[in-house]
Structure formats: structure tokens, C-alpha cells
Amino acid sequence: MAIALTHYEKKSLKLFLGIYLGSSFVLMLVISVLAFNYEKNEKIKMIRMDMDKMASKIASEVIALHMQTHGDYQNALNALISRYKDASIALFDSKKRVLYSNIPESANLIKNHKEAGFFSFRGEYYLLSDETFAHLGVAKMLFKNSKPLHFSSLYRNIVLVFVVAFLCVIGVSVFLGRLFLKPIRNEITRIDHFLKNTTHELNTPMSALVLSLKTLEDNQQHRRIKIAIQRMSFLYRSLSYLVMQDIERESFVLLDLKALIIKENTLFSEMIDYHKLEFKSDLVEVELKAKEQDFISLYSNLLMNAIKYSVMNGYIHIELTHAFLKVKNLGYEIPKDKITELSVRYVRFNSGVLGYGIGLGLVKKVCEKYKMRLEIHSEPSLKGSFYENSFCVQFQG
């Protein structure tokens, strides 16, 4: 049965395949290059062996003819040449003058190669031999490979084998990747079902608690209960957004950000009053095409973060322009080395404040989805030893 992969599983599988296939590709490429060079060198060795055999054979015949001939060396040499007229060969005397040659470039080659040996020139292979020891006046012999050596067929074969083998590796790696992901997928599915069921079951009691807030009398103890319920409600909303977003079918609409922010501010007003915070907002009319729950999650988490980390009798300032949304509060210093970690889920810079460290993680996730940029700054304030902490979402990231 085929396994349908989720977004996170696809990401993990792509990462696994990227590393596995990348390393396999490099390894197979190195092996292919080594194989090509090995086969090429073997062919060149065979050519040299054939040329060495011919050189030894002709040298032995030259020496034998010299021994058998009494002074008539030229005729003996002509007889030898007639037997090897089809071979690519050149004969030279001790002064490097050409005695015979059917190799056009032999005169130039003998000038540049003084020592006997095997060499290549412009893609052709040659052997210079001095085994005749000047018998019959022949001091050196030059041989040329009669059949040009082409490696195109070898190259094609290696490329074909490489492609077929790499396709097999891709198939095996995809199969193994899915196989390894299956038990992880089962566990994630179990946890996911549990979270969604729990979130669904919490909906009714949370709604009842929120509705019952209106019936509580306005005294200090009841205000604390109200604040606790509001925080639970906020946490429930964040949890719902977190676990339900993969099945959410909400469409993109043109949002009135100012109206949404004012609505959220109303929901948090009692909590702001409870912490004795000065609240000020400077909002302009801004429209943004997005999902409503995404923006609500982004703003409500920024605002809740500002409330939690504000000092008593501090302030919260909200600023909305066409370029950015900024939430500022008066609180304690955020160390510069901690700023980059704040948007990591479950990370908090002040462990003395209640929370789970998921708020800015959700903010960052929404920012990435809409290609926005989250900037965090902590600057000294004029009010005592406190700092003004600024969380700014740039709409054009």
C-alpha cells in the first residue's frame, strides 16, 4: 500500500535523499572517472606492447640482415622496408637523417625527442627505439600507432552504466526512505490524532468558561480568575492554530489589519489593565491578502508576549504602517546573543515568566509563510534600568 507523505515527511525525505544521493553521486562519479582512466591506460599499455613487439622484431631482422650482408646494406635495407611498407614506421641514421619514413611528422618528432621511449603527440602515440645499434645504418626507429585510438565508445559505455546505476540507487533510496519513515509516521499520526481530539474536546469547556466570565463579580479574586481563563483561552487558540493548520481550508482574503488589531486589543484589554500597563496604538488603514487566522495568530502572540514580559506599570505601544507592524514594551533586557534564539519553539529568555515558548515560534512560522521578516531589538529606556523591547514584522521581507 502506498504511503501518502505529509509536508514534514516530504521535507525529511528530501533531506535524506539529498544527502544520500549527493554522496552516492560523488562516489559513483569518482569510481567512473577511475574506471575510465584505468581502461584508457590499459588500452595505451596494449598499444605500447604491440609497438614494442614490432620494434623488437624489426630490430632483430635489421641485425640479422647486417650479419648476413657483406657490404650491400642499402639493398638489404630496401628489402626490409618493402616487407613493412604498410606499417607506420620511420628509420633514421646516427645523424637523425631520414632513411625512410611514411610518417609525415617524423622529421620534427626526431628533433624534439632525443631519448628512446613511448610518447604521445597531438592525440597520437609513438615509440622511438634504438635497439638496432646502427646496424644497416639504422640508428633509430620511430613507430606510430596505425589505428587512431578513440575513447568515445568507452566514454559512452561508462556514462550509460553510470546513469543506469544511479537510477537504481535513486529507486532503492526512495524505497528505503519511505520504509524508514513509516514507523515515525505512525507515531506522529498517533500524537497528531491525540492533540486534535484533545483540542476538540477542550472547545466546549473553554467556551463555557469564557461565557461565564460575564457572571463573575468585579473583585480582585475574580479578576485573577478572569485573567487565568483569558490566558487559558489564548493558549487554547494557539494550540488550535498549531495542530489544526494542516487541515484548515480557510482561503486567502483581503484583510483589514487595523480592524483586526482593534478587535484583538479589546480581547486583551482586561489583561492589560490587570498588569497596570499603559497601552497606546498608532494604526493606519492597511490591507493584506492573507488567511485571517494566520494574522490573528501573529498579532495575538506578539501582544501576549509583550504583556507577559512587561514590567508592572510599564507600557505597550502598537504601531501599524503600510511597511511594518511593531509591538514595543517596557521590560528587561534581551541579551543580543539570545535574540536569534527567541523565535525557536520552546525557547524563552526569561524562565521566571510563565509560558511555553511557542508564541514567537508561531510568529516566525507565519512570517516565513508570507515572506515577512521579524526583527527584534532591545534598547535601554529612559525609565530607570529597564529596556524598550521592540518586535517588528516587516511586510516586505
Swiss-Prot record:
EC number: 2.7.13.3
Pfam family, one: HATPase_c
InterPro entries (alphabetical): HATPase_C_sf, His_kinase_dom, HisK_dim/P_dom, HisK_dim/P_sf, TCS_sensor_his_kinase
Kinase as UniProt keyword: yes
All copies of domain Histidine kinase, residue ranges: 197-395
GO cellular component: plasma membrane
Protein's GO biological process: phosphorelay signal transduction system
Primary localization: membrane
Topology relative to the membrane: Multi-pass membrane protein
Gene3D superfamilies according to UniProt: Histidine kinase-like ATPase, C-terminal domain (3.30.565.10)
Highest taxon above the source species: Bacteria
Localization per Swiss-Prot or TrEMBL: Membrane
Disruption phenotype: Deletion mutant is not able to colonize the stomach in mice. It also shows a significant loss of viability upon exposure to nitric oxide.
Entry-annotated residues carrying Phosphohistidine: 200
Role description: Member of the two-component regulatory system CrdR/CrdS that induces the transcriptional induction of the copper resistance determinant CrdA in response to increasing concentrations of copper ions. Functions as a sensor protein kinase that phosphorylates CrdR. In turn, CrdR functions as a transcriptional regulator by direct binding to promoter regions of target genes including the crdA promoter or nitric oxide-responsive gene promoters.
Name recorded for this polypeptide: Sensor histidine kinase CrdS
